Swiss-Prot record:
Record-stated family: Belongs to the NAD kinase family.
Catalytic activities: NAD(+) + ATP = ADP + NADP(+) + H(+)
EC top class, as a word: transferase
Its job: Involved in the regulation of the intracellular balance of NAD and NADP, and is a key enzyme in the biosynthesis of NADP. Catalyzes specifically the phosphorylation on 2'-hydroxyl of the adenosine moiety of NAD to yield NADP.
Protein localization: Cytoplasm
GO MF term list: ATP binding; metal ion binding; NAD binding; NAD+ kinase activity
Gene it is expressed from: nadK
The protein's name: NAD kinase
Coiled-coil ranges from the UniProt annotation: none
EC number(s) recorded for this UniProt protein: 2.7.1.23
Residues the record marks as active site: 44
Cofactor(s) in the UniProt record: a divalent metal cation
This protein's UniProt keywords: ATP-binding, Cytoplasm, Kinase, NAD, NADP, Nucleotide-binding, Transferase
Organism name: Paramagnetospirillum magneticum (strain ATCC 700264 / AMB-1) (Magnetospirillum magneticum)
Top-level taxon of the source organism: Bacteria
């Protein structure tokens, strides 16, 4: 791939801002709104922020790690950037779209690149009913919470909650409970990526629940619908020797 106009964006850390200054001195660059590729300098959190920021542009984003976690980032090097971009492999992600309805009647809609999670707000456990494509699959789940993860997000919160790591292109999503009390032995499910999942919050007044799509939170929800948004393409670029598919496989063999 040959790119004619590059933009740089950076997290608000000293390391990221210092890298930004050096790279902008070294390479011709334009404003992000005019670029045909964006270089994101930071960690995974900043990469998610950048993907959300430019979601309507479908501009490829190439991350370089200047943060603490860099699963979604390439190795930081200042030299040879143009050549690296020309050899980079493209990964297209489709985010989840969350539609949440709160107790006050407010409708909250947001995209999630990693996962949509439902979490109890108080000492009371959450009590949920789960519908998949209109059919009740679990009439009552008592838990601290539950999440629906994309393949790209399966190594994040999902993995910490003991959910499965999913290869890119598998065409599935992970439904993973968080500290399930009843049914105690339920460990979640793998769903087709086309599935529409609806969570109904039972006893919502007594057991308040929040819903979070990446970093957009809705409090006191009573119903949450989640499904993949195939109309939204998020384009990421990775070095061939360390692409996202390879990282997901490697993550499964870490000690």
């Amino acid at each position: 791939m040959i790119f004619s106009s590059i933009a740089f964006v950076a997290a608000e850390t000293e390391a990221a801002k210092a890298a930004l200054a050096r790279l902008e001195q070294r390479y011709p660059h334009v404003d992000p709104g005019e670029a045909d590729v964006i270089i994101a300098l930071g960690g995974d959190g900043f990469m998610l922020e950048t993907l959300h920021r430019f979601v309507d542009r479908r501009v490829p984003i190439y991350g370089m790690n200047r943060g603490s976690v860099g699963f979604l980032m390439n190795v930081y090097r200042e030299h040879g950037l143009i050549e690296r971009l020309s050899k980079a492999e493209e990964v297209i992600l489709h985010p989840l779209r969350m539609k949440a309805r709160t107790a006050s009647g407010e409708e909250v809609e947001a995209l999630a690149i990693n996962e949509v999670s439902l979490l109890r707000e108080t000492r009371q456990a959450a009590k949920l009913r789960i519908r998949i494509d209109g059919k009740i699959r679990m009439d009552e789940l008592i838990c601290d919470g539950i999440l629906l993860s994309t393949p790209a997000g399966s190594t994040a919160y999902n993995l910490s909650a003991h959910g499965p790591i999913i290869p890119l292109g598998a065409g599935i999503a992970a439904l993973t409970p968080i500290s399930a009390f009843r049914p105690r032995r339920w460990r979640g499910a793998l769903l087709p990526h086309t599935a529409k999942v609806v969570f109904e919050i039972l006893e919502a007044g007594k057991r308040p629940v929040s819903a979070v799509a990446d970093y957009t939170e809705a409090r006191d929800v009573v119903e949450v619908e989640v499904r993949e948004d195939r109309t939204c393409d998020l384009v990421m670029l990775f070095d061939p020797e360390h692409n996202l598919e390879e990282r997901i496989i490697t993550e499964q063999f870490l000690p």
